[in-house]
Structures are given as C-alpha cells and as structure tokens.
Amino acid sequence: MAFTKSKQPRKQRKALFNAPLHLRRKVMSAMLSKELKEKLGKNAIPVRKGDVVRIMRGDFKGLEGEVIKVDLKRYRIYVEGANNKRQDGREVPYPIHPSNVMIIKLYDKDEKRFKHIKNE
C-alpha cells in the first residue's frame, strides 16, 4: 500500500496523518501467530474488534485479551485487561499501537472477512 512514492520522511508522515479511513485500516495490521500464519498463508492482517491478541511490547507485555475498540483516527487499539488507573480511581483502557501485538485468535463470526483474507 503506497500512500506516496516519495522517500522523504516528512511526506511519508504527512501521508499517514492525512490518510482516509479506508487506507488507515490497512496500516492497523498486526502480525499473526504461527498457527494462523500457516492456516491463512499471511504474516499480518488488519486488527478488528473481537480478535484475541497478545501484547508483545510495553508495560502490558504478555497480556492476552480481546480487542474492545479499534481507533482508526489515532492508530490505536484497546485490549481487554490493559487499563490505567486514573487519579480518581477509575480504570481507563490503555491505547496500544497494533504493531506491538500479535493476533492469536480471529473473530470468527464474520465469514465475509475470511473470504476477503483468502482472496488477498
């Protein structure tokens, strides 16, 4: 997926910031576990709400949980169990970049998604 043909970092960054939502989805890809790689024949696919992921980097490294929200505008996902405590004691979900997670189990209620993955 080429936003721009330029090699200049400033133009690459600008393309990311100004990308339309349908192209942002592609950037929100995460690597697949070994079993899923063999099954699907792909290294990475876009993350979706309902997928089960393992966090590979950061403070929550090793945590496995379901994706509860995908934020295309901020390029972040929210995983069940990855929470920060606010000053008043409330738990708030912690935003994680999809490059720092591995998809362990795909959301299986969407047949159309599997057909789309196979055709790519």
UniProtKB/Swiss-Prot annotation:
Coiled coil (UniProt feature): none
GO cellular component, one term: cytosolic large ribosomal subunit
Keyword match Ribosomal protein: yes
Swiss-Prot/TrEMBL GO biological process terms: cytoplasmic translation; ribosomal large subunit biogenesis
SUPFAM superfamilies registered for this protein in UniProt: Translation proteins SH3-like domain
Domain of life: Archaea
Record-linked InterPro entries: KOW, Rib_uL2_dom2, Ribosomal_uL24_CS, Ribosomal_uL24_euk/arc, Ribosomal_uL24_KOW, Translation_prot_SH3-like_sf
Pfam families assigned: KOW (PF00467), Ribosomal_L26 (PF16906)
SMART domains assigned to the protein according to its UniProt record, in alphabetical order: KOW
Example of a GO MF term: RNA binding
Keywords carried by this UniProt record: Ribonucleoprotein, Ribosomal protein, RNA-binding, rRNA-binding
Keyword Ribosomal protein in annotation: yes
Subunit structure and binding partners: Part of the 50S ribosomal subunit.
Function: One of two assembly initiator proteins, it binds directly to the 5'-end of the 23S rRNA, where it nucleates assembly of the 50S subunit. Located at the polypeptide exit tunnel on the outside of the subunit.
Family: Belongs to the universal ribosomal protein uL24 family.
The name this protein goes by in its record: Large ribosomal subunit protein uL24
Native source species: Methanocaldococcus jannaschii (strain ATCC 43067 / DSM 2661 / JAL-1 / JCM 10045 / NBRC 100440)
Higher taxonomy: Archaea, Methanobacteriati, Methanobacteriota, Methanomada group, Methanococci
Gene: rpl24
